[in-house]
Amino acid sequence: MGILGLSKLLYDKSPNAIREQELKNFFGRRIAIDASMSIYQFIIAMKGFQDGQGLELTNEKGDVTSHLNGLFARTLRMIDEGIKPIYVFDGKPPKLKADELEMRRQKAAEAEREFEKAKDAGDDEMMEKMSKRTVRVSRDQIDESKKLLRLMGIPVIQAPSEAEAQCAELVKKGKAWAVGTEDMDALTFGSTVMLRHLNISDAKKRPIAEIHLDEVLQITGLSMGQFVDLCILLGCDYVPKVPGIGPQKAWEGIQRYGSIESFLESLDTTKHPVPADFYYKEARAFFQNPEVTPAEEINIQFSEPDEVGLIQFLVKEKLFNPDRVNKGIARLRAALTRKTQGRLDSFFTVTKVPQQTAAARAPLAGTKRPRDGKYVHVSGTLRKATSGHKKAVKK
């Protein structure tokens, strides 16, 4: 879930902290990517629906390959633009997340039931909608994704707990420039720069949102501690929401009272009963001191692609088109041997111009704002595969 409604709130309260960018603008940047989120997006993007059946991208043996197709293609696309991706995988979820995970399981089970009802009613639109809500990334898909990335020579990091927290640790310690994810809690964990919509296909023409935490804090006048409290009130993965407290009430509460403690004291609990398991202090502590591997202990290294290994895995085992794989290997080698061109901003010291506070700045009239959402669906259509892979009915 990330942080419920935070994206829209930031567009409302601190639009100047968010820049719209193209992929090519991140040339030379190391980006720590939330791997599980990316793989989920690839699976959703390549999932179709026809004649009352869910369709998945498979090879001739019937193996689902949507995660590998998406990961291979998008990683190559980033490499072509001079970006250095670092994929970070989730570890064991914290105990605070147990209720959220159980809720997700219940929602998936409910989606399965709604799918069957829609099937009986012949409602194809509802069937397709419910089918996508049941998508989960399997352990095998995670393991295969790690294998592919390592064969490509791309760094893979296993987080001890939350991937977004580990990504933020890399950014805070200078091992990466930004976190690439759809989950807004990368900012809550302290990442100084966050990129959303990084995995959207170029055909969609949706800009990448580059969000700067320091500018969010400067414009809103919030301290980092107050920002964390705001995120908890908005709704996060670790505690339930307080009933009736939406984005505007949460914003006004932190602006006026400065902390969750003081805000709760002001609440009319007959209208806003605080859940017994609203363990906000524990959630706050986790955001401020999550379980991560210290960045100093992580050796990030980009290496030569394993040509033999890639052909064995993708062509012989997964039945990818040999030409496509060989061209991909050539692109990886070209990226390593390409004469490195430094970013222009690395030659200068940049002094930031102080910005006005939100109260002093006039509202931006007529500004179009992207919709807020939990996940971004990378593609809405399935094209005929040219790599020996096809849409197959999910069994």
Curated annotation (Swiss-Prot):
Posttranslational modification: Phosphorylated. Phosphorylation upon DNA damage induces relocalization to the nuclear plasma.
Ranges for region I-domain: 126-257
Chain positions recorded as DNA binding sites: R74, E162, G235, D237
Region (Interaction with PCNA): 340-348
Record has rRNA-binding as a keyword: no
PROSITE patterns from the UniProt entry: XPG_1 (PS00841), XPG_2 (PS00842)
Gene3D superfamilies, alphabetized: 5' to 3' exonuclease, C-terminal subdomain (1.10.150.20), 5'-nuclease (3.40.50.1010)
InterPro entries named in the record: 5-3_exonuclease_C_sf, Flap_endonuc, HhH2, PIN-like_dom_sf, XPG-I_dom, XPG/Rad2, XPG_CS, XPG_DNA_repair_N
HAMAP family: Fen
Family membership noted in the UniProt record: Belongs to the XPG/RAD2 endonuclease family. FEN1 subfamily.
Subunit structure: Interacts with PCNA. Three molecules of FEN1 bind to one PCNA trimer with each molecule binding to one PCNA monomer. PCNA stimulates the nuclease activity without altering cleavage specificity.
Name recorded for this polypeptide: Flap endonuclease 1
Gene name, Swiss-Prot/TrEMBL: FEN1
